[in-house]
Amino acid sequence: MTDPKSQNEGRHLEEGRTLILTGASRGIGHATVKRFSSAGWRVITCSRHAFPENCPWAAGPEDHIQVDLSDPADTARATSEMKARLKDGMLHALVNNAAISPKGTDGKRLGVLETETETWRHIFEVNLFSTIWLAQGLREALAKAHGAIVNVTSIAGSRVHPFAGAAYATSKAALAALTREMAADFGPLGVRVNAIAPGEINTAILSPGTEKMVEGIPLGRLGEPAEVAKAIYYLCTDQSSYVTGAELHINGGQHV
């Protein structure tokens, strides 16, 4: 049984730390906000949507930044705003969770032959390039705090997926490679960079037919957003102080 005293001491140690999270509007993003907030972190959320009036967590619009991550100019503008909001210019964690995965007009996955060039470009700008732009722009703040970066990839980045489109899957495979490159480049700055690769997670955007895929998952169930958030938290804290360049599979054994 967890000692309440040790829990309070742990929260005290975490207070004053700041996380910037992209893609916070639902699912894994929501769960991540809750996990870090419960540990005393300040969470600055970023999404293409304005701050919702019915926001499920306590933070207000002062901890939310609306940004179009497909637009390098707007991302640069948002990055400047992020830095202006940081206490003492320190950023303890950056989680790149935002991603898009467009479907065809019939709701089916877009393969290589069906995906237009503009769609490829848009997906890569959000899913891959924005990660680079944010990491470059926030480099000094992360280094000052000896912080951590977590990139959210996907099981679709390592195998053909029945629902995830070709451009989405390719962008996630590229993000896994980028994570290794970033770990090498950010390591000398004292910043760790890792990735998590979720499998089938029980969110509101599950594709029809996902229930059949559960039969092939060794643990026999979908993952929960809170389980993904716990892994992200681990990679952003001192619990993983000697872990960098890794991609953690969170899929109930689906990848084996």
Segments and roles (model prediction):
Residues 25-26:
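Conserved glycine-rich cofactor-binding loop
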Residues 222-255:
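C-terminal substrate-recognition "lid" of short-chain dehydrogenase/reductases
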Residues 187, 192, 243-245:
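Short, small/polar-rich loop/turn modules that mediate ligand/substrate recognition or access, typified
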Residues 154:
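Residue(s) in the substrate-gating loop at a strand-loop-helix junction
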Residues 105-112, 116-121, 213:
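Substrate-binding pocket helix/loop in short-chain dehydrogenase/reductase
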Residues 97-108, 252-253:
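Conserved NAD(P)H cofactor-binding loop of Rossmann-fold oxidoreductase domains
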Residues 135, 171, 179:
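Active-site helix of classical SDR
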